[in-house]
């Protein structure tokens, strides 16, 4: 799990630099504050590592994730099939998809940030040390910084342009000839397979075999939509006699292949460095729209350099004493109390339009918020996955009744505005739409050059799975919820 720290610590530091140091450097030059922030971020990563070692992450990897991906493919194909019917032409594919598998975070656009806030707020109660979790100011700052970054990351990752770029990058990586000698490449591949096999041996993956990844790959590469009556006998013979053995071997291959990808990210130095650089670059690019980021970049750099120059000289014992004895709120309460909260009044939501009852008071360029708007009752973010069906009503309680239980009279009207699907395209395309179409065609061309794989997974099916921003958001929020429920089982039993 030490590999996880090397991946997450730079990301946490970058988030703190953007959402905390950018505004704090303008009101104070306290060198102890950023040191405490770095310690809190390190404690969060350390606690997350301990939970990953204690909890059964194999359930998440070999059941929850492939289950959600299978449901995503099935619902997408079902929505496309219903859209092809004459009575389905009046609805969009995303609307049909939403009716098949609704997600509470996508009922309204305002719900997405509220969903991330509630999720991070409940997680921080178990990740922060006891002394730090008592500070309301500290919890609010960390909640807003992490929630906004998660929200922005999902917004960027779910866009079709990002998916097309990922397809192009992956296609070029597969087609690019290896610079290593073939013997070294084979040795490296065998080493990654051995790492993956060793992980399977020390977990429940072997005695409790999961065929979920095999079912996912079978669903992904399957091109036959239905089976004719003449093939029923053949399929019955196949599924009763041959399928269990094929599924057993294929499940082992699928699990090993999936773990090889994860092991490569953690153990391959080049891939690890490229992955961290990509994440940090993405986080920096998300903050380019910050109007105050450019004017404060120099102050933030100087502030961090000044604070970190004296911080490494302190021993680990002193750091633990400092963390356990003082929280961020106790360090400089006068600084926080002097922040003019009413200088930028929060925007009021129009409840008549079915928006959420929690006011989004966080300004993306400033991490200081009004403490009166902090949710005092823990409410857990859920979707309709098997792990979280019991707690959906908790988050629904934050949504007005017009959204949570629409009447039959305004069902069609509410579905047009009740969840954040992209707007209908117009006849005249904008330059961004033209660039998206060009990028889409480039992704299709690059993918078509890959050997063998396009034969089993046609490009039109691949594009259908990634072309919708709403459906991409749906799968990301569902994966986030499943990760939370598996790593934090305490949330299932909280009322």
From Swiss-Prot:
InterPro entries: Phox_assoc. It is a multi-pass membrane protein. The chain crosses the membrane at residues 7-27, 235-255, 446-466. GO terms for cellular component: cytoplasm; cytosol; endosome; endosome membrane. Residues 402-436 are annotated as: Disordered. Disulfide bonds: none annotated. Residues 1-174 form the PXA domain. Keywords: Endosome, Membrane, Protein transport, Transmembrane, Transmembrane helix, Transport. It is found in: Endosome membrane. Residues 402-419, 427-436 have a biased composition (Polar residues). One of its GO terms (biological process) is late endosome to vacuole transport via multivesicular body sorting pathway. Required for required for normal vacuolar morphology and for vacuolar protein transport. Also required for endosome-to-Golgi protein transport. This is PXA domain protein 1.
């Amino acid at each position: 799990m030490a590999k996880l720290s090397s991946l997450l610590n730079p990301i946490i530091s970058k988030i703190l630099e953007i959402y905390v140091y950018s505004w704090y450097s303008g009101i104070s030059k306290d060198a102890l504050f950023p040191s405490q922030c770095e310690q809190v971020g390190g404690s969060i990563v350390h606690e997350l590592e301990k939970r990953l070692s204690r909890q059964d992450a194999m359930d998440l990897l070999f059941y929850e994730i492939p289950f959600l991906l299978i449901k995503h493919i099935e619902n997408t194909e079902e929505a496309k099939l219903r859209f092809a019917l004459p009575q389905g032409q009046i609805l969009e594919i995303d609307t049909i998809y939403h009716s098949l598998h609704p997600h509470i975070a996508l009922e309204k656009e305002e719900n997405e940030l509220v969903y991330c806030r509630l999720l991070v707020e409940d997680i921080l109660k178990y990740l922060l040390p006891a002394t730090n979790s008592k500070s309301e100011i500290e919890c609010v700052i960390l909640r807003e910084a992490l929630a906004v970054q998660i929200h922005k990351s999902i917004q960027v990752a779910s866009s079709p342009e990002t998916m097309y770029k990922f397809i192009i990058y992956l296609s070029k990586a597969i087609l690019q000839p290896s610079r290593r000698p073939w013997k070294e490449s084979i040795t490296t591949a065998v080493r990654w397979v051995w790492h993956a096999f060793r992980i399977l041996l020390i977990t429940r993956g072997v005695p409790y075999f999961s065929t979920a990844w095999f079912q996912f790959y079978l669903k992904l590469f399957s091109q036959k939509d239905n089976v004719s009556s003449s093939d029923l006998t053949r399929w019955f013979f196949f599924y009763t006699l041959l399928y269990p053995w094929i599924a057993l071997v294929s499940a082992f291959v699928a699990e090993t292949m999936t773990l090889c990808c994860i092991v490569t990210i953690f153990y391959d130095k080049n891939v690890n460095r490229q992955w961290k650089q990509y994440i940090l670059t993405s986080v920096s690019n998300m903050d380019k729209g910050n109007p105050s980021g450019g004017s404060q970049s120099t102050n933030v750099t100087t502030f961090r350099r000044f604070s970190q120059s004296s911080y490494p000289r302190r021993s680990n014992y002193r750091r633990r004493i400092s963390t356990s004895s003082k929280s961020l709120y106790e360090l400089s309460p006068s600084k926080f109390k002097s922040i003019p909260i009413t200088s930028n009044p929060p925007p009021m939501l129009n409840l008549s339009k079915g928006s959420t009852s929690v006011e989004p008071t966080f300004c993306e360029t400033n991490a200081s918020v009004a403490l009166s708007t902090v949710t005092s009752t823990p409410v857990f973010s859920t979707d309709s996955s098997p792990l979280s069906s019991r707690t959906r009503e908790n988050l629904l309680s934050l949504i007005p009744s017009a959204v949570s239980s629409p009447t039959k009279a305004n069902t069609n009207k509410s579905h047009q505005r009740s969840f954040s699907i992209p707007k209908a395209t117009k006849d005249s395309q904008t330059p961004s739409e033209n660039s998206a179409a060009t990028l889409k065609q480039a992704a299709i061309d690059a993918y078509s050059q890959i050997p063998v794989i396009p034969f089993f997974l046609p490009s039109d099916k691949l594009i259908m799975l990634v072309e919708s921003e709403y459906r991409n958001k749906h799968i990301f929020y569902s994966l986030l919820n499943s990760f939370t429920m598996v790593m934090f089982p305490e949330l299932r039993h909280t009322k």
